[in-house]
Amino acid sequence: MREFVNLKFEEMPKVWYNVLSDLPFKLDPPLDPETNKPMSPEKLLKIFPAPLLEQEVNDTDKFIDIPEEILKEYAVYRPTPLIRANFLEEYLQTPAKIYYKYEGQSPTGSHKTNTALAQAYYNKISGVKKLYTETGAGQWGSALSYSGLKFGINVNIYMVRVSFNQKPARKSIMKLFNGKVTPSPSRNTKSGRKYEENHPGSLGIAISEAMEEVLQRNDSKYALGSVLNHVLLHQTIIGLEIKKQLEKLNIQPDVIIGCHGGGSNFGGTILPFIPDKLSGKNIRFIACEPESCPTLTKGEYRYDFGDTAGFTPLLKMYTLGKDFIPPSIHAGGLRYHGAAPIISALLNHNLIEAKAFSQEETFKAARLFSKLEGIIPAPESSHAIAGAIKEALNAKKENKEKIIVFTLSGHGLFDLNAYI
C-alpha cells in the first residue's frame, strides 16, 4: 500500500526558518569589488527591494512570518506530500525506508515557485514594476513569470541558450504567463555580445545580462532563483513541512538528500534540520551535484563573483571560477559555477556532505524511479534519486534500517527529450 503523509492547509507552517540565527559562526559578508570591503546597503538597493535585503542580512530572528498574500498563493499547491517509495524499496530489496517530498505539484512544476511568489510580492509592495532574471532549465523563469503575473509585475528572462534550444515547452510556459524570454548570450547587452551567437551559455552569463539591464535602468529590480540567503529562507517551507510530516510518522531521519546547483532546493530541504545536527543528533545531509559541474566536490572555497561579467558583489562560496562554462548537460538548472554562501559555509564546517554523479547514473536512476513510482522526475531532481538509491544500497550492505528522505524538486514532463 502506497504511504502518503499529507498535511491540511491549516497545518502548513506559516513562517520561514532563518538558519542564520542558529549557526555557531557568522557568514563572511558580500564584498564590494571596487573596495574589497563589505557591500553597502545603498548599492544593493539598486538591485533588490528593501524587504528582501532585510531578509538577506537578518541573522537574529529565528522565524519570519509569511505574509497573508503569499499564504493565499501557497494554498494553490501547498502543503506538498511526503511519499514513501515502497516500490523502489522493494526493487532494491533494502531494509531502508525511503521517503520523498514531492514539489512537482506546484503551478509550474518545481520548488522554484516557493521563492518566486515571495520575491514578486515584496517587489510589488516596494513599487517595482519590472523584474529581470536568468534561468537555466526554465523552472525559475517559469515560476517567476507565473508569480509576476499574480502580482502585476513584468518579468524579463535571460534563458541559457543550450536550455532555450533543448526545452521549448519551458519557453511556452513563460510566454503563457506573460514572461519575455531571450536566449543568452544575446545581442541585447555588452555582457552577451562578448560571446558568439551560438555559444551554449551559462547561468553566470545569463545573470550578467539580467544584472546589466537592471543597473542601466531606474524602473527595474533583479530577482535570483537560488544562492542568496533570502532565497534559501523562502524555500525552508519545504523542510518545515517535512519535519511535521515525519513527526506524524513518529520517525527521525538518518539521511536527508537533495540535488544541488545553487543551493535553494537543498537548503530549503535541510536547513530546518540543522538545529537537530547542532544539538548532537546523528543525521547526515547530502548534496548531490553533477560530475560535469562539481562545485561542492571540486570547487575552491573563496570569494568570487556570482556572475561571469563581475556585476554582482563578491560572495564567499565554493566556486569553479566565474568563467567556468559547464558542458551542455540536460540538468540545466545545476549548471552553475558557484554555490550558496550558507551551503558553502555548512560544507566548510563539515556539517553537510557533497557527492557528484554522472549524467548516465542520474538518468538510470530517473528511468527506474519513473517506472516504479510513476513520476517522471526533472533531470535536476534525478541527482537526489541517485543519491537516495546509493544510500539505500549501502544500508542493504550494512543491513541497517535507515530512514532516507529526499526532495523530488520537480517533474520532468517538459524534459522528455532528455529521456529519449
UniProtKB/Swiss-Prot annotation:
GO cellular component, one term: cytoplasm
Keyword terms of this UniProt record: Amino-acid biosynthesis, Aromatic amino acid biosynthesis, Lyase, Pyridoxal phosphate, Tryptophan biosynthesis
Catalytic activity: (1S,2R)-1-C-(indol-3-yl)glycerol 3-phosphate + L-serine = D-glyceraldehyde 3-phosphate + L-tryptophan + H2O
Enzyme class: lyase
Function: The beta subunit is responsible for the synthesis of L-tryptophan from indole and L-serine.
Cited HAMAP family: Trp_synth_beta
InterPro entries (alphabetical): Trp_synth_b-like, Trp_synth_b_CS, Trp_synth_beta, Trp_synth_beta/beta-like, TrpB-like_PALP, TrpB-like_PALP_sf
Full protein name: Tryptophan synthase beta chain
Assembly behavior: Tetramer of two alpha and two beta chains.
Modified positions (N6-(pyridoxal phosphate)lysine) in chain numbering: K112
Needed co-factor(s): pyridoxal 5'-phosphate
Gene3D superfamilies: 3.40.50.1100
Family, per entry: Belongs to the TrpB family.
SUPFAM superfamilies xref list: Tryptophan synthase beta subunit-like PLP-dependent enzymes
EC number: 4.2.1.20
Top-level lineage group: Bacteria
Recorded name of the encoding gene: trpB
UniProt pathway: Amino-acid biosynthesis; L-tryptophan biosynthesis; L-tryptophan from chorismate: step 5/5
Transmembrane segments: none
GO MF, one annotated term: tryptophan synthase activity
Record organism: Thermosipho africanus (strain TCF52B)
Lineage start: Bacteria, Thermotogati, Thermotogota, Thermotogae, Thermotogales
